[in-house]
Curated annotation (Swiss-Prot):
Required co-factors: Mg(2+)
One of the Pfam families matching this protein, by short name: PEPcase
EC nos: 4.1.1.31
Keywords attached to this entry: Carbon dioxide fixation, Lyase, Magnesium
Source organism: Streptococcus agalactiae serotype V (strain ATCC BAA-611 / 2603 V/R)
GO CC list: cytosol
Catalytic residues, chain numbering: 138, 594
Gene: ppc
Catalytic activity: oxaloacetate + phosphate = phosphoenolpyruvate + hydrogencarbonate
Residues in coiled coil: none
Family membership noted in the UniProt record: Belongs to the PEPCase type 1 family.
Functional summary from the UniProt entry: Forms oxaloacetate, a four-carbon dicarboxylic acid source for the tricarboxylic acid cycle.
NCBIfam families, sorted: PRK00009.1
Molecular function terms from GO: magnesium ion binding; phosphoenolpyruvate carboxylase activity
Protein's name in the database: Phosphoenolpyruvate carboxylase
Length: 931
């Protein structure tokens, strides 16, 4: 399906005006802080950057004192942030503009539904499609929450710029407000003084739900149903979008995730969504002032209204208001019942005195209701379904007496939200490394006198033993009297908490447990043993789905055999049957890329999906994929629409899950317009891939796949030859990148490595990619690509034409190359050379020459296959964006290099070390997808 891509703006000059205005105000704020003489140096640096005089730039920055570095770092870190805001505002305007004129754009939902409506299974497809963005707290989100709140205010003001130009909004006041917030942000710390805790990550992510996601998901779902209805397809209870969450449940490599953080995550989520419902009920209460003297109501509505404690004479004839009052009181009590307390009033008090993590979400309405309570026993909702039934009772009364139009709007949105979010908001995933599960199971088996050294058993022996425990003995292995290691106690506690939360908030609060580094069937049975210990799994059913994560090249290659064996067991089939016949498999993009390079990773993942989909079909099971993507191309990132539509045909049955990480969350969901558009695109792309076969000739696709096998083999060899076989590469990475400084940056609760780093394989994929972004090589997104294509073309001169055909006709290959094109455009080998000079020895510095040669070769090969003269020819919007943003954050690289030099030569006092973190922050902001 072909769609026009969104342009920068219907008015091409407006974004230039906005950026100019924001820069002017930043200049004013900076000059006010430091004076005209010092600001002259910033103006000189700006001039040098805009004329690409990098020799002069390097000399000027080297001459700056440490004190002068402070303001230069801050200025050039904030400027890209303001440019981002302008772009976001402009994109939102363009989306609304095209929607208002009924124009098409990439990912437009109405266009997708128009197409799918002609499909023979249209209703089934639209009823069951489910896209699940899963928000994670991987350490790539470098912005402080305070800064995000300030940028949100600037964003809201900039949205009014066109109205200011048209004279609709008072220019003087608007300008003063914008000046004030830019002045504040210039004087606000943009980096964290202390490392985030898990509880901070939880509350930070909740801000996106409050700010944009709840309303965007609800609105989009309602629009989805309405568009289908226009095509004569009446959907019963579609959930095209539901949300997922890793924060609080992902303990792989993060010792700070515990049973307490899991409970906190669930409780805060519940409070956020229930508070949203309370706010919506407030709106309904204010607006639904229908008098019984002027309209009829159903007997059921009267019964509901009469239970209200609102005895005001002014509302005795307003049954709808009284009904909403009663519903609201029950909902408030439901919220309070989540906290421990004896009497209703004590619960309110504990609510008000609770920690700021929870208290920030409780609105003043609760205190008001608390002061009016007269009874000791207040009703509460046991389930979200009970709450929904009361709302439907109101709806039915309105419809019964001809008030259909009043159902639309707030009431319909509220009912829709309850359907989507329940009382839990987002499903929390649990995740742990397979080695931890094995250690816990080994301890349990030894404690129960079953086997002394479980880990020494063969894979076959392990499976036989675990299968026997899972099918033949309903008793648990653990005993309350038996001593347990700290690790086992911690793991059992988090599983027990998961069960309690499912009992309290509903099954959907926790549905999956992911096993990192899944390498065998026994890895999955070991998790089952742990789940059995707390009653979450037995011989007939599983209340939590076991999700293997295949992440290295080797594990992905072995995934077919592992899953074939796993699905062979009748026990496993019973578990899957209780999950509506779905078996989820998570695919790791980050580790596979670090393991084998971009081409090898991408192709191995593609083949694995094909093979695993076939296994599912052979067993009558729906295999669904969870894509563990990051922000960068090196971690599976890139444009969302193309990423989804380039998946193998048939790999998306009706459900797809994908991680949204770090700064990508802010970029995609920082405001309601952006959230709506990006979520709309995810749904459209998933449906498009489900119904549209891009290549209809099976022989052609087989030929393309055979070609890729040969190309990837060469790419993998070239990549591993440098990364794992070159004796100087390790030192080059650690000396010619800011990896040490990135690892100390307070950007997440998770450590940068699972253990002390002595080799590349021990480093987490995220700081690995983040550091290559900082030194502007973007290594994980392209290295090995050029050599592989050159080798293939040298075998036969006709092979270039073959690659060009693959690029034109095969979405997977097109997306692969387009991502490399984008990454190359953001790299800068002149800057990378300056980082290389940081390395101590000539042998280590010479690694850069190997990288540079491959970079040039990759660029030449990509342009030849795309048949383009320049990079980004098919992405003019990004090209324009980089044109006006690159000069500014290129400055930050030179500042960072100089600061690292001073730090490593002991010329930078401890007080100034955080300047390096400011530059890291600014470069990540400018790139927009840093990790």
């Amino acid at each position: 399906m072909s769609h026009p891509k969104l342009e920068s703006s219907s008015n091409k000059e407006i974004i230039t005006e906005e950026v100019g205005l924001l820069k002017q105000l930043l200049d004013e704020a900076t000059q006010k802080l430091i004076g005209s003489e010092s600001f002259d140096k910033i103006e000189k640096i700006v001039s040098l950057s805009l004329t690409d005089d990098y020799t002069g730039l390097k000399e000027t920055i080297s001459a700056l004192s440490n004190e002068e570095m402070v303001i230069v770092s801050r200025y050039f870190s904030i400027l890209p942030l303001l440019i981002n805001i302008s772009e976001d505002v402009d994109l939102a305007y363009e989306i609304n503009y095209k929607n208002n004129l009924n124009q098409d754009y990439l990912g437009k939902l109405s266009t997708t539904i128009d197409v799918v409506a002609g499909h023979e299974n249209a209703k089934d497809i639209l009823e069951h499609v489910n896209v699940v963005p899963v928000l994670t707290a991987h350490p790539t989100q470098v912005q402080r929450k305070t800064v995000l709140e300030l940028t949100s205010k600037i964003h809201d003001l900039l949205r009014k710029y066109r109205d200011v130009k048209a004279g609709i909004v008072n220019q003087e006041k608007w300008y003063a407000d914008l000046r004030r917030y830019i002045g504040i942000i210039m004087q606000t710390d943009t980096i964290r003084e202390k490392k985030l805790k898990v509880k901070n990550e939880i509350t930070n992510v909740m801000e996106y739900y409050n700010r944009s996601l709840i309303k965007a998901v609800t609105k989009l779902t309602a629009e989805y149903k309405a568009l289908a209805a226009k095509k004569g397809i009446h959907l019963e209870n579609p959930k095209p979008l539901t949300m997922g969450m890793w924060i609080g449940g992902d303990r792989d490599g993060n010792p700070f995730v515990t049973a307490e953080t899991l409970r906190l995550s669930a409780m805060v989520q519940s409070e956020v969504i229930i508070n949203h419902y309370i706010e919506q009920l407030n709106e309904l209460y204010r607006n639904m002032s229908l008098s019984i003297n002027l309209t009829e109501v159903s007997p059921e509505l009267v019964t509901l209204a009469n239970q209200s404690q609102d005895n005001s004479v002014y509302r005795e004839n307003e049954p709808y208001r009284k009904a909403f009052n009663f519903i609201q009181d029950k909902l408030v009590q439901t919220l309070l019942n989540l906290k421990v307390g004896s009497s209703p009033k004590e619960k309110f008090v504990s609510r008000q005195e609770s920690s700021d993590i929870v208290g920030r979400y409780i609105k003043s309405h609760i205190a008001q209701v608390a002061s009016d309570i007269q009874t000791e026993e207040l009703p509460a909702y046991a389930t979200a379904e009970e709450f929904k039934q009361d709302l439907l009772l109101v709806k039915q009364s309105l419809v019964q007496y001809g008030q259909d139009s009043l159902v639309d709007g707030e009431l319909a949105c509220l009912i829709q939200a309850v359907d989507i979010f329940g009382f839990y908001l987002a499903t929390i995933d649990m995740r742990q490394d397979s080695s931890i599960n094995e250690a816990c199971v080994a301890e349990l088996l030894k404690s129960a006198n079953i086997v002394d050294d479980y880990s020494s058993l063969s894979e076959e022996e392990k499976c036989q033993l675990l299968l026997k425990e899972l099918t033949e003995d309903p008793r648990t292995l653990s005993s309350t009297h038996a001593p347990k290691s700290e690790l086992l106690q911690k793991e059992l506690a988090i599983f027990q908490t998961a069960r309690e939360l499912k009992d309290q908030l509903g099954e959907d609060i926790i549905n999956q447990h992911i096993i990192s580094h899944t390498e065998s069937v026994s890895d999955m049975f070991e998790l089952a043993i742990m789940l059995k210990e707390v009653g979450l799994i037995d011989a007939n059913q599983a209340r939590i789905q076991i999700v293997p994560l295949f992440e290295t090249i080797e594990d992905l290659d072995n995934s077919r055999d592992i899953m074939t064996q796993y699905l062979h067991y009748e026990l496993v089939k019973k578990w899957i049957a209780t999950n509506n016949n779905y078996q989820e498999i998570m695919l790791g993009y980050s580790d596979s890329n670090k393991d084998g390079g971009y081409l090898s990773s991408g192709w191995t993942l593609y083949k694995a999906q094909n093979e695993l989909t076939k296994i599912g079909e052979e067993n009558g099971i729906k295999i669904t994929f969870f894509h563990g993507r990051g922000g960068t191309v090196g971690r599976g990132g890139g444009p969302s629409y193309e990423a989804i539509t380039s998946q193998p045909f048939g790999s998306i049955k009706d459900r797809i899950r994908l991680t949204e990480q770090g700064e990508i969350i802010e970029n995609k969901y920082g405001n309601q317009d952006a959230a709506y558009y990006n979520l709309e695109m995810l749904i459209s792309a998933s449906i498009d891939r489900m119904v549209t076969r891009m290549i209809t000739n099976p022989n052609e696709i087989d030929n393309f796949r055979e070609t890729m096998d040969g190309i990837v083999s060469e790419s993998n060899a070239v990549y591993r030859n440098l990364v794992f076989d070159n004796p100087y590469f390790y030192d080059y990475f650690f000396e010619a990148s800011p990896i040490k400084e990135v690892s100390s940056l307070n950007i997440g609760s998770r450590p940068a490595a699972r253990k002390t780093i002595t080799e590349i394989s021990g480093l987490r994929a995220i700081p690995w990619v983040f550091s290559w972004s900082q030194n502007r090589i973007m290594f994980p997104g392209w290295y090995g690509v050029g050599s592989a294509f050159k080798h293939f073309i040298e075998q036969d001169e006709a092979n270039l034409a073959k690659l060009q055909t693959m690029y034109q006709k095969w979405p997977f290959f097109n997306s692969l190359l387009s991502n490399v094109d984008m990454v190359l455009s953001k790299s800068n080998m002149n800057i990378a050379l300056q980082y290389a000079q940081l390395a101590g020895s000539k042998e280590v510095r010479d690694v850069f020459n190997i990288i540079l040669n491959e970079w040039q070769l990759t660029k030449d090969m990509i342009l030849a296959i795309e048949q383009h003269d320049n990079l980004l020819e098919e992405n003019p919007m990004l090209h324009a964006s980089l044109d006006y943003r690159l000069p500014y954050f290129n400055v930050l690289n030179y500042v960072q290099i100089e600061l690292i030099k001073r730090l490593r030569s002991n010329q930078l006092d401890e007080d100034y070390e955080k300047l390096i973190h400011i530059t890291i922050n600014g470069i990540a902001t400018g790139l927009r997808n840093s990790g």
